[in-house]
Amino acid sequence: MRTPRNRLGAILAWSTAVCLFCSAVNRSHGTEQTTGPAADMVQRLGCQRGICAVLGLPEGREAAFVTELAQGNELVLFFQSPEAAEVAQVRSAAEEAGLLGQRLFVAEGNYQRVHLADNLADGAIVSKSAAQIVKDSELLRVMRPQARTVLPDRVLEKPVADGVDSWSHVFHGPDNNPQSLDRVARAPYLTQFLAGPLFVPMPEVSVAAGGRVFRAFGHISHKANQNAMLNTLICASVYNGTILWTRPLPEGFMIHRNTMVATPEALYLADHRSCKVLKAGTGELMDEIVVPAGIADGPVWKWMALLDGVLYALAGGAEVPVSTQPSTVRGLGHWPWGMWEGHEYKDPKTNFGFGRTFFAMDPATKKVLWSHREDEHVDARGVCMDRARIFYYSPEKFLGCLDASQGRVLWRNDDRDLLAAIGPNERAQHYVTGYATTTYMKCHQDYLFFSGPQRQRLVVARATDGTLLWTKEHGNFLLVLREDGVYAAGPQEPGKGADSPTGYKFAYEDGAVLAELPMRRACTRATGSVDSVFYRAAEGTMRIGTADRSVHHIAPMRPPCQDGVIISDGMLLWGPWMCGCNLSLYGHIGLAPAGDFSFRPGSDDSRLVSLSDTTNVTPLPVTAQDWPTFQGDNGRSSRTATAIPASPTQQWSLDISAQGFPTAPIAAGGLVFCGDHQGRVWAVRARDGALQWKAHTGGAILVAPAVADGRLFAGSADGHVYAYEAATGRPLWRFRAAPADRWIPVYGKLMSTWPVAGGVVVQDGVVYAAAGIAHYDGTHVFALDAATGKVKWYNDSSGTTSPEMDHGVSLQGELSIRNGELRFVAGSVHEEARFDLATGKCLNEPVNVPSSGFPSAYYPYYPEYGPYTSLDCRLPDGRLLCYDASYEGSWQSQLSLLPAAVAAAQPRKPLARWGLQRRGQPPQGLWQKRQAQWFRGFVVHDSALVATGDEEPDAQGKHFLEALAMADGSTLWYQELPGRAVRGGVAINGTGQIFVTLENGQLLAFAQK
């Protein structure tokens, strides 16, 4: 038996929650710097990290040239060529170098169309043969602004697009109005990237400019998965999510305030010591600015803005220190609110953000242009500015205004009616209201607005003198100030439905109601784009089309609590999450304008490629005792007719993938099959572990293949379904289920926007497959003739089951067939997608409210959260073998055998098993397994079962393969495994051999002595 690999390393290689976080300031890019033609080419690119497209092999170069491009840097390479032989050579070289499916992705395709999303690549290298075909416009399409394409005779650089805007300040601008001026980021959208980190501590503050987003993460972790980012600053590409650099933040400073400003050249980041000026591209410290001596109560930066080259600030004395709070709590969902350190705001002298001195400075020379000191403390949450004036509020004392050019007081208003309307600060710190640290004052043209978690009512005052104009009850409106009116996302109110109108569009001059808006969920910030307003729905994201007030529900993800949806450089950015709300997509997510993209192009002959004779196929005998598909059958029952061996031992092992992550195994006809995340299909002889054949697809294989009628079928993350002669590996046909060849980064890998992520099921000569991730991109479901690959039916409309809400089916689970229906976990809006097997009609009823009620954490994307396999297996006599594990791996029940009468009375369980932990005492079974074990896969026979899993749900625990007697649950035999099994990663064949695939890349076989 070989030495087991470190399982954590295998997981991190796949999960960008950590793998993209591995860089740090001043760390060299990649390994040793190299020399030679490839290194020279990278130097011409001027890019050491990000995504680089490579079109064809340069004249006279071998495939190794492409792998050499990856040396001495951290580039992710996408190679494309129309030549099958060239594609095969590069795949082979990438495989040998350990880069395939990790840092080098290979696609077959002509040069007229590069298979990458718009604005995605950080560089491109074009061979002579490709340069003769591909147009400059196509190269510019896939390049991000300011990226270079190296052609044989020139270098092409993409200019910055007209009409883009930045998100330079925490609330977009110093006016605190979260309304973008970007004219490019228009609906509809397509996913641009899904990236890490997935989860981060609070608070979270973000700004963006020059194609980069800067995110600062604070001091409080409520879940263990947030600890890695405590007190950390990251810089990431807004175009592909690549983390460009990271930097630690000083402990003890509460970051949730306006003290971060981004420009294309620099990030200004202030704290309790100084304002650091960091080089935007590298994080290098270029300068440091301190509060000038003698003008303030101390060195602490309370508020900051940068406008027309002048740095404005509010400074003051030391604040309540905050302590770093890591967590040991597992899982995703929910955390406790409370009055955390300093959040009670009980002393103006030490409150977060309270200061008495404003000043303006030339940041280049550090010359103070002016300073102004107040006797009373000013609350930085109540500070904003337009191009000429700084507005500021001293709680319950006065509202004031400074001339930004000279620092003189323009007016001060302490009118009783005004102060009474604004009122004292409320407590906040509740999931419905939000954070006490939230900014509550905004300005727009001639108006000042007070609203937020701490406010009793919405208050509007005149910007010229502070005169009270109008008020509205409920102070916790989230405002977006647009030219056509004041958009106020209304508070969550108990007992009201998800589509209830608690929000409004108000007129500026008098607060007249111009329109009603659907209720928002809880505390998350509202933001605005050129044509939309975004806020949190009753889970998910609400998008209000401002032209017609139409409702569009983006179901799989919600805006992050303290940032909302950020719009910058023509892109829309979500996450990462500091909360743990139950959704389907997590992490740092980018959406791009779809432009004229055809979401429903229909099906035509171009999708199918016949690769060889499809009629004469070598038979592969499959018996009823075999395991020809994931979890044994199309219903995913994990049942077998094969008797469990009495005392097996390990027969052989095979290293399938050095980088880890094979799929679950299947077994039929004397062979064992699996796929892997490098895009390979493996066929291994069951008797001795010898390789029978191996084939490559274009993308990761995320779910086990299936065998039927002498053919093996696999769904690939490149958006295709592949068919092979199962006995020999001869390719038969390839079918593109994705509507287009459009690759994006998905949690550390490049894959299609529409991967065939749920695997395939085969029944009665028909292969069923689905392509997609998120409903708003479209979900594409096909029934194909198993012999020829020809389309029998297709459904390309289920992504929108409710035109009223513009939401529908996402693809977030393995395909199955039950009750004459094709099914899979549907991601948020619908618990399970359902399609008529004969016609492809979607059977899900429309959900005409903006609600995401069904969480998921699909194992191929989140292997650290969704690895455990729930089981409800009914035996012939009516007894029920059951095990429940929550979708995100934080809770489980005991593995139990229920008597028939008890089993018949069991209520329906949610697929996510979320909420079962609150149902009270589970029913008494005939036997229960000890709860310390966490189960990943099962093989169930009438008299015994085999289970694989973990003794403890952490990387250090033992991992096992165990057989239990069905009669009493006693252990028949127990084998310790050298790593964690993949989800559902156990199979049995007709001779009683048991096969297990491990996340560390091993395939193991066990057989009776």
PLM regions: where:
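Aromatic (tryptophan-biased) beta-strands that constitute blades/sheets of beta-rich domains
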Residues: M41, L45, R49, F105-E108, ...
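A short glycine-rich, Lys/Arg-flanked "PGG" loop and its adjoining helix->strand segment in the class I
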Residues: I133-A147
